[in-house]
Amino acid sequence: MRPGFSVPGESGRERPAFPLPCACGTLRPMPPPAKKPAQKKKPLPLLPDFRFEIEEGAPARLVCGVDEAGRGPLAGPVVAAAVIIDLTRCPEGLNDSKKLDAARRADLLAELADCAEIGVGIASVEEIDEINILHATMLAMTRAVASLPRAPHIALIDGNRCPPSLACASRAVIGGDALARSIAAASIVAKVTRDRMMAALAETHPGYGFEKHMGYSTPEHFDALSRLGPCAIHRRSFAPVRKMLSPGLEEGLDLVSGESVNLLIQKAY
């Protein structure tokens, strides 16, 4: 081994120094294995705040949050709520209604009734079947905003589209019920209101379990449909219900009217 290309090794042996020339190039020591970057811990989920409301000028301008409950069920109306919150008197723990249990939603609704302006809008089963669930939802939202004690300057709408016939400006907020407090409040109002309406409808349409599943597609609901057939508050335009209707029964259904819905709203509260 040529001088200058070896270093003392263990037991007096010599080992080659690096780099060494070879037929395929220069040999270099293997770099140490790269350390994996430490994985960042996922931040804890945050509660909705007033960021969107403040961006739209609150509290100087009236900003309402709007959300709905009941787009997916096979039975019952779709309910929307619009809420204007006093930024200085906001109940603690406001969140997307789906993340709260029924008792907590009821408590928050009671608090909101004392410190917020609330409007509720309904689209009946008949309207859902006539204009489809999407347009019925937009109609319910429009009615909710129109029923507020004061007309807002702008409405923050949960989702990716806004009702076209609102009397004020609007802004769609995807996932808004988990981001904006006024939308979270609206989701709670809409959910509790509709649940109470479905419990009242369960009394006049027994056997379906509406007070438990609120008209959603559950095994219990499908079992009742197969035994009893659709009733007056089932949505004929929804495929699972439509498949169970005979032509004669479809013509004879006595659907829930807007006037009946207003009575149910009063009973819900």
From Swiss-Prot:
Its main location: cytoplasm. It is an enzyme of class 3 (hydrolase). Endonuclease that specifically degrades the RNA of RNA-DNA hybrids. Its EC number is 3.1.26.4. This is Ribonuclease HII. Gene3D superfamilies: Ribonuclease H-like superfamily/Ribonuclease H (3.30.420.10). It is found in: Cytoplasm. The gene is rnhB. The keyword NADP does not apply. NCBIfam families: PRK00015.1-3. GO terms for biological process: DNA replication, removal of RNA primer; mismatch repair. Its cofactor is Mn(2+); Mg(2+). One of its GO terms (molecular function) is RNA-DNA hybrid ribonuclease activity. Belongs to the RNase HII family. InterPro entries: RNase_HII, RNase_HII/HIII, RNase_HII/HIII_dom, RNaseH-like_sf, RNaseH_sf. PROSITE patterns: RNASE_H_2. GO terms for cellular component: cytoplasm; ribonuclease H2 complex. It comes from the Bacteria. It catalyses: Endonucleolytic cleavage to 5'-phosphomonoester. Manganese or magnesium. Binds 1 divalent metal ion per monomer in the absence of substrate. May bind a second metal ion after substrate binding. A divalent metal cation binds at D67, E68, D158. Pfam families: RNase_HII (PF01351). Keywords: Cytoplasm, Endonuclease, Hydrolase, Manganese, Metal-binding, Nuclease. Residues 61-250 form the RNase H type-2 domain.
